[in-house]
UniProtKB/Swiss-Prot annotation:
Similarity remark: Belongs to the TRAFAC class TrmE-Era-EngA-EngB-Septin-like GTPase superfamily. TrmE GTPase family.
Name under which the protein is recorded: tRNA modification GTPase MnmE
Any one of the GO CC terms: cytosol
Residues annotated for GTP binding in this entry: 231-236, 250-256, 275-278
Native species: Oceanobacillus iheyensis (strain DSM 14371 / CIP 107618 / JCM 11309 / KCTC 3954 / HTE831)
EC numbers: 3.6.-.-
Gene that this sequence comes from: mnmE
UniProt domain TrmE-type G: residue ranges: 221-380
Higher taxonomy: Bacteria, Bacillati, Bacillota, Bacilli, Bacillales
Residues the entry annotates as binding (6S)-5-formyl-5,6,7,8-tetrahydrofolate: 23, 85, 124, 459
Amino acid sequence: MLDTDTITAISTPVGEGAIAIVRLSGSEAITITSQIFEGKNLQEVPSHTIQYGKIIDPGTNEVAEEVMVSIMRGPKTFTREDVVEINCHGGMVAVNRVLEIVLAKGVRLAEPGEFTKRAFLHGRIDLSQAEAVMDLIRAKTDKAMSVALKQMDGRLSKLIQKLRQELLETVAHVEVNIDYPEYDDVEEMSHAMMKEKSKEVRDELDKLLQIAQQGKILREGLSTAIIGRPNVGKSSLMNTLVQENKAIVTEIPGTTRDIIEEYVNVRGVPLRLVDTAGIRETEDIVERIGVDRSRQVLKESDLILFVLNYNEPLSEDDKKLFEAVDGLEYIVIINKTDLEQQLDLDEVREFAKDRPVVTTALLEEQGVDELEKAIADTFFTGDIDTGDMTYVSNVRHIQLLKQAKQALEDAMEGIELGMPMDIVQIDVTRSWEFMGEIIGDTASDSLIDQLFSQFCLGK
């Protein structure tokens, strides 16, 4: 599974910029770069240094680019191989020219995520740490970045390894009892001891799963729909949160005829904000399409921001919207409180039941702090603490933790039924294997290939 050839790729985003980087990794990385580099002898310079020089096109013997070359010798590198990073001028022409010259020397173009995959296969990081690399790149808030950094640092890995070790010692103890019953110096593993150990690990997994939803929110963001009758201030709400005009705000009801999306950071919680067309019955075919799409978005949302107009009584359409969001997670926003009151607030609270109700005058920027607090408090109690918490944010990890927990509960049930110890240990071993998939110890080659294929090229 481990390729040993030298690979290369552009490691910086496509487009114009001050600097672009062509990365190489493999046993021939330094040798090949030295063949196209005019400057100091790269094979003799100290590791982890950067050298100024020029890239020479072997085909024309002309200067192709002025560069700074970083030399890093394995195993003290990300991939644990020799690594070279050619820093050239930004822009597609310059960086592609350097890449073409490197490829012409026989270096293979890297597959997506192959540098990180090599780091994993060489034991530099485990699978959960490798996945955290991509989470870090995709992080949309400081809190999400903090969670990814801690996972990259091995916080989750160390906990999983500790729990797996406890299960492994338990299984090994049982096997010694079964295979070598004559060993009097080895205490027999009783059903009570096995149940106690299984419960201890199960409880630790349960703690992780209890805050897993919060971790998933920090990683992926909340799909948040803004709903309400036309002209109640939905676009004004989005504009206030995004702090730039993404939707046209007019006095004509029904202006927003399509789905408008934007990511926003609300007190560390990433929201994928969706401004829907006003949900109402309409004869306008174009608007009706937008309304149908809005209803679908509603069903798929994690959170709904339901906007009402302080300047108008509660309408039949408003009441239908309350019916539509019944059983869903939503916050009621009473907007336009700077105008004359026509809305019965007691009636609104009766329809909202125990859901949060926030008053705003968005065009006057009033009530925004209270709204942001209500959003954060809906999913997090108080300030979001990423310092001492071990968050599980990856859906794959969450599913495996659930399976590991269930396997231990199966073992505990077997003990209650008086099943033989060698049968009970099968479920304990299953739990150990499920946790091993998180860090890659028991993951299949096909799973590993599939995970790394989701990475960006050059990472």
